[in-house]
Every structure is written in structure tokens, then in C-alpha cells.
Amino acid sequence: MAAAAMTSIVPVASIAPVSKVANVRPSSVSVAKAFGLKSRSMGRLTCMATYKVTFLDGETGAENVVECSDEEYVLDAAERAGMDLPYSCRAGACSSCAGIIKAGEVDQSDQSFLDDSQIDDGFVLTCVAYPASDCIILTHQEENM
């Protein structure tokens, strides 16, 4: 009788080993997956800042304000909001998406096109710019570079 009882025991849950590289408790990874959360940081959940990015259309004068996390390129946030901004390479290697920062700060360390003087003049490549504060960007500025 005791043998029959032991064969009917089934584990309710098993925890898969976690990579030593990730150095994350399995419970936090499980909770993240259960809620559908995703992270670029190898399973660790991180907080991200969200900023208001105001786009001033250099051609029409239209103004659009978009919420953008510090882990999203401002061009992607604009497109998510339904805006149609110019772009070409989406890699920071051309000037199609060029804008001018009128206020605030961005991290555009992924870009490889602008030289230091253009950056000092406020030029930004929206396809590879993360907001670092609330900011105002004048768009459609490739012709003014």
C-alpha cells in the first residue's frame, strides 16, 4: 500500500536551472514570464524612465507630444504614435532622420554619422536617439545640416 502511494506523487512545479551568467533568482524570472514582462538585461527586471518628447514638424509646424521610454528610440515612439517622420537606414549612418534638439537631452551614442560640431549645433538622428529627459525636437532638418 505504501508503494502505491509513492508512485502517485507528482511534482507540482519544477524550477529549471538558471544560467550562472544571468545570476538571477528563478522566482523573479518566473514572475516576469508569468506577467509577460520582457527585459534586455538577461532576465533581470529593470525600471525605465519615460519622457515626453515633443516633435515640431519643420515643414508643417505641427506639434506632437509622445511618451517615450529611455529604452526606445524617439523615431520608434513617433511611429508608434502614428507620426510619419523621414528615415532611411535606421542605424544612425545617414542623415535622413535628422532633427535639431531645441530643449532637453538625448543619448545618441549609437550614431556614426554626425561629427562633433553637428552634435554641438543640436543635430540629432532620431532613428538612434534615446531620450534622456523631456525634450523638444525640430524634425525634417536634413537640408539644414
From Swiss-Prot:
[2Fe-2S] cluster binds at C89, C94, C97, C127. InterPro entries: 2Fe-2S_ferredoxin-like_sf, 2Fe-2S_ferredoxin-type, 2Fe2S_fd_BS, Beta-grasp_dom_sf, Fd_pln. Binds 1 [2Fe-2S] cluster. GO terms for cellular component: chloroplast. Residues 51-143 form the 2Fe-2S ferredoxin-type domain. GO terms for biological process: electron transport chain. It is found in: Plastid, Chloroplast. GO terms for molecular function: 2 iron, 2 sulfur cluster binding; electron transfer activity; metal ion binding. SUPFAM superfamilies: 2Fe-2S ferredoxin-like (SSF54292). It comes from the Eukaryota. Its cofactor is [2Fe-2S] cluster. Its main location: plastid. Keywords: 2Fe-2S, Chloroplast, Electron transport, Iron, Iron-sulfur, Metal-binding, Plastid, Transit peptide, Transport. Residues 1-48 form a transit peptide. Belongs to the 2Fe2S plant-type ferredoxin family. Ferredoxins are iron-sulfur proteins that transfer electrons in a wide variety of metabolic reactions. NCBIfam families: fdx_plant. Forms a complex with heterodimeric ferredoxin-thioredoxin reductase (FTR) and thioredoxin. This is Ferredoxin, chloroplastic. The gene is PETF.
